[in-house]
């Protein structure tokens, strides 16, 4: 006689546990959005107010600690670290965002073509993607940067090259799943032009998948940009990026650890927040069928 109440209790307990997990997940997601938003907003304000333009001004002694003039200390030339931190964060974000936007556009186009048409188009696109995907990401980025020379353009192109393969594969899978649905098949039979099908029927149904992959690509882009600049293949002096600040601070790690720790913390927190936001986007927008196919 106690079987039914026990089963009901277990169902309710499982339901409450699920709701509790969702609340915790939402709280983590909101925290990540707020933290990343603060980083972006403060950086934008610093750029707009010209604070990043004072990076060459000497305000104190070499490798000084925090003070009223230099809130997070000075570097090896006596310059305040705070304006350079803002400049480095802005450079890293701009390079990464531009690269991911370019990669998302190219990957979406290639993935939709391969998934929609199949056949030769699919073979060509996927084989090229497989070749690029076979290389370790940072090694491929270094090769591209070495060929093009260091600087922002080389960093952007390197990130585009390493993020296109995976995004293209995922978009192709999502496109194939949507292209087999009745409303796409009926549109093709009715003679609707392919560009119209792509723009009005395919793209809206895979936009969630694209957003998820773009968010993950952004975290990869920030990490790779930092790695390239740290190794001397990315942004060059007198500009600054988070990776370059870490590389310059390594020489004075024992005397002024904040030169490495603070840019490193900003880099790690940014990547962590973007990954959490990507997980939230995946849970809300990406279909389960696409995840299982992958």
Regions inferred by a protein language model and the residue ranges of each:
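C-terminal transmembrane helix and the adjacent membrane-cytosol boundary/short C-terminal tail
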Residues: 162, 208, 212-216, 257-294
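Transmembrane alpha-helices
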Residues: 90-106, 141, 195-227, 274
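Hydrophobic alpha-helical transmembrane segments of membrane transport/permease proteins
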Residues: 30, 34-77, 232-239
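Transmembrane-helix boundary motif in ABC transporter permease subunits
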Residues: 46-49, 95-130, 142
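Transmembrane alpha-helical segments of polytopic membrane transport and secretion proteins
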Residues: 1-37, 276-294
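Glycine-rich helix-loop "coupling/hinge" segments at transmembrane-helix boundaries
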Residues: 133, 144-147, 159, 174-175, ...
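Generic hydrophobic transmembrane alpha-helix motif, especially the helices
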Residues: 71, 75, 115-116, 121-177, ...
């Amino acid at each position: 006689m106690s079987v039914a109440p026990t089963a009901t209790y277990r169902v309710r307990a499982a339901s409450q546990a699920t709701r509790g997990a969702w609340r915790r997940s939402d709280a983590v997601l909101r925290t990540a959005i707020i933290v990343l938003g603060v980083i972006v907003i403060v950086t934008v304000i610093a750029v707009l107010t010209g604070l990043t333009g004072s990076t060459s001004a000497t305000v104190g002694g070499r490798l000084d600690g925090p003070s009223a003039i230099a809130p997070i200390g000075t570097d090896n030339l006596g310059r305040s670290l705070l304006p350079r931190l803002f400049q480095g964060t802005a450079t890293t974000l701009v390079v990464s965002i531009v690269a991911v936007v370019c990669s998302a556009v190219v990957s979406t186009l290639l993935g939709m073509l391969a998934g929609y048409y199949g056949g030769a188009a699919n073979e060509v696109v996927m084989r090229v993607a497989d070749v690029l995907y076979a290389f370790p990401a940072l090694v491929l980025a270094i090769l591209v940067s070495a060929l093009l020379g260091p600087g922002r353009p080389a960093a952007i192109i390197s990130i585009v090259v390493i993020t296109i393969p995976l995004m293209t594969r995922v978009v192709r899978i999502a496109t194939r799943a949507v292209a087999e649905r009745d409303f796409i098949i009926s549109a093709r039979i009715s003679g609707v032009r392919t560009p119209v099908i792509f723009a009005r029927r395919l793209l809206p149904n895979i936009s969630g998948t694209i957003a998820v992959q773009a968010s993950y690509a952004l975290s990869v882009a920030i990490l790779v940009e930092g790695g390239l600049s740290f190794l001397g293949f990315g942004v060059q002096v007198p500009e600054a990026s988070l990776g370059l600040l870490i590389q310059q601070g390594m020489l004075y790690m024992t005397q002024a650890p904040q030169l490495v720790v603070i840019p490193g913390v900003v880099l790690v927190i940014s990547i962590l927040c973007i990954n959490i936001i990507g997980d939230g986007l995946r849970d809300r927008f990406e279909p389960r069928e696409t995840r299982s196919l992958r």
